């Protein structure tokens, strides 16, 4: 499995701690160092039943500065993928990519690893 997170995010830190305590093997990717591409975001979104808004870090500074709360409804799905790909800090985290192709985002990641 692969986890995409931000090293300073408290949620990411706690999920990684749980994974380590359970002895889970994983690859880690820092979302700030290696921004997700539009193609990746599209693929992840299509692999879930989440609304694309679920992929936005709505409590993040960039989301608020750009007033995306009011802009998202007027954007096409493709424009939303493009916007998410502009900065990893816009993307909700952590994102867990499971070996079977399943994708989990945000609080669902914690629930999943706690249940293992």
Where are these regions (language model features)?
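Local sequence-structure signature of Cys/Sec-based thiol-disulfide redox active-site neighborhoods
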Residues: 1-21, 26-31
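Thiol/selenol-based redox catalytic cores and closely related redox-interacting motifs
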Residues: 33-116
